[in-house]
Amino acid sequence: MANAERVITRVHSQRERLDATLVAQKNEVFALLSRVEAKGKGILQHHQIIAEFEAMPLETQKKLKGGAFFEFLRSAQEAIVLPPFVALAVRPRPGVWEYVRVNLHDLVVEELQASEYLQFKEELVDGIKNGNFTLELDFEPFNAAFPRPTLNKYIGDGVEFLNRHLSAKLFHDKESLHPLLKFLRLHSHEGKTLMLNNRIQNLNTLQHNLRKAEEYLMELKPETLYSEFEHKFQEIGLERGWGDTAERVLNMIRLLLDLLEAPDPCTLENFLGRIPMVFNVVILSPHGYFAQDNVLGYPDTGGQVVYILDQVRALETEMLQRIKQQGLNITPRILIITRLLPDAAGTTCGQRLEKVYGSQYCDILRVPFRTEKGIVRKWISRFEVWPYLETFTEDVAAEISKELQGKPDLIIGNYSDGNLVASLLAHKLGVTQCTIAHALEKTKYPDSDIYWKKLDEKYHFSCQFTADLIAMNHTDFIITSTFQEIAGSKDTVGQYESHRSFTLPGLYRVVHGIDVFDPKFNIVSPGADMSIYFAYTEEKRRLTAFHLEIEELLYSDVENEEHLCVLKDKKKPIIFTMARLDRVKNLSGLVEWYGKNTRLRELVNLVVVGGDRRKESQDNEEKAEMKKMYELIEEYKLNGQFRWISSQMNRVRNGELYRYICDTKGAFVQPALYEAFGLTVVEAMTCGLPTFATCNGGPAEIIVHGKSGFHIDPYHGDKAAESLADFFTKCKHDPSHWDQISLGGLERIQEKYTWQIYSQRLLTLTGVYGFWKHVSNLDRLESRRYLEMFYALKYRPLAQAVPLAHEE
């Protein structure tokens, strides 16, 4: 029998596949692309492209579904129409992009590079331009020699890939272990040596003395305190930091011996995660009203504040436990740096230092914005902070030095402004940097890059997108709450992924901004505060003292600045939502879906908590949404079935409010056009409230559709309303269905979304990235020089062009 020859199959490009399809299904493809072209000059998003397909005759749809073109179409994220051309950005899988352009006059297909596609896209705004030089940003050359995975399973698990690669590189022979020895010998805190002293000069001595220590420890009782053998260990070169008891020290020593003998990534991560490396943490969140009381619902003040306050308490608990278990007597410190607001609007935002409730060593440290004229007194929108941040960074550096009497071990940035300040500080101080986006505005506002000039006066996106690019490329590691935030899903583009290639016409063109396969990305999901948010079934913990206040909020016949409209039928289940009142949160969208759906209105009441009608808003977007809400109430005659409650700032009572909605057998709806994570989704599910949430962003990952909640498409509100009506109809006939979804949500939270899991992971990541930064070229010096130039030549002039706030 002849040996079968191995056949190598070449993967065809999108252009070749489209060429083949045009031969096989020429008429049908031409008909569809002609529909797209007929829309005229402009951009069609993925859902609009699919809508054009679904508007075709069923017979044509059927033919196309049977061929390769349909898969191509499903992968097309946008279409650029400049008749007779249609260009398509095709995404066969997360993080992988190809570009093609079709000439509909002669049905010629050409493949484009990212730069060519972006240049074509710019013609929508600037027309055809010849000879004009446009700055192109490309970070790819700096990463050419740096390893990165190609499999989707590694997206968001960068530390595992990094450990695999660098452990193989560093530990391939005994000589290559010297960087680890050097790291352990140099490791110290405030001048005090940790781990190893100068009695250990080489690897042979290290291994020999570790074995001696192992033999000695095996003779001791496991609970023997480190202090009882500290001097003996110092004589053989071992300092504090290995553990507080004989058992823990022995485990740590064995981990290192295993690494020296047969290194593997898992052992390496465990060892690095236990080295005492994090004692002082600085967290940056400049914008908004950052305080602990009476601020939620103020402009630019929402989930991020809650996230950080929960984060620092969990971090402190984990740091204290680790420091104790490492056998150290060091007091940790966590500083949340935000803006000091002299006009504090009845909050503590004018106070320099504020202790975080429920913590021992966490403080909010406020530093004012200032100009040459002095301190800026008033609140400033997050879209207008850019001209103040460089001076703010210098002032923050001085305040940190004063408070900590030294440098922090970790700097964490939050949102665009906090991440830029974190980048500047980390660069200045040489400290490990972590980035948390919370939300990247480019994703929230479709086409805000290509049409940035139209939006810049109001939003200053040119500054913000530039700051985002600088921060995400400067940072040591990025943590996200979900995979969606990084690389989206099969059908939706991730927040970070949308920064891979884009253009700001007339400013610069980003050919390669960020790669979702970069090992700096790690998914570390937060949770809800379990002392506030817990299941409605935990009767003994229920805060029934709030029930009279909650009933007043929901059912009072009084209409005032706190609650507008009344609920006539108090026995109906309640659809509940709570968020800031802005365009992207889409609360007015939910009200409109409800208003239009007669069946849903008969089944349930709607309660919306958002916006503050008790005072005049300073936020233009909130004003516009308020106006829309009033109009919807009148248009759909909602009074009697709808209640609009001003923002509620008491988190403890809000926790009981979720549980009270559970008692009505209601549901929580998160209708955002895009949501990076969805903390309110986690809060609602933690209380056992069945949840319907946007399919765009993090909630699509938090919720397992049909099991622990439901996904809804905010761009198809009619279908979302029908989905809600179907759920409540089913619950009416089978009450156990409500219980089933409620329990599914609770189980989902316990397995993945708790602050304890979060804090353990964050500290381990800090240790791992801090080590690799020390012993390898992970600090990416070349790209940081590139970023310095980009900051000075592009960001700074853009920031200086943003008008300063008018002070009366």
Curated annotation (Swiss-Prot):
Nucleus listed as a keyword: no
Listed GO CC annotations: vacuole
Induction / repression: By anaerobic stress. By hypoxia in the roots (at protein level). Up-regulated by NUC/IDD8.
Tissue-wise expression: Detected in the whole plant with highest expression in young rosette leaves and roots.
Catalytic activities: an NDP-alpha-D-glucose + D-fructose = a ribonucleoside 5'-diphosphate + sucrose + H(+)
Biophysicochemical property: pH dependence: Optimum pH is 6.0-7.0 for degradative reaction. Optimum pH is 7.0 for synthetic reaction. Optimum pH is 9.0-9.5 for synthetic reaction.
InterPro entries: Glyco_trans_1 (IPR001296), Sucrose_synth_GT-B1 (IPR000368), Sucrose_synthase_pln/cyn (IPR012820), SUS_EPBD (IPR056736), SUS_N (IPR056735)
Superkingdom assignment: Eukaryota
Record-listed E.C. numbers: 2.4.1.13
Spans annotated as GT-B glycosyltransferase: 277-754
UniProt record similarity statement: Belongs to the glycosyltransferase 1 family. Plant sucrose synthase subfamily.
NCBIfam families per record: sucr_synth
Protein name: Sucrose synthase 4
GN (gene name): SUS4
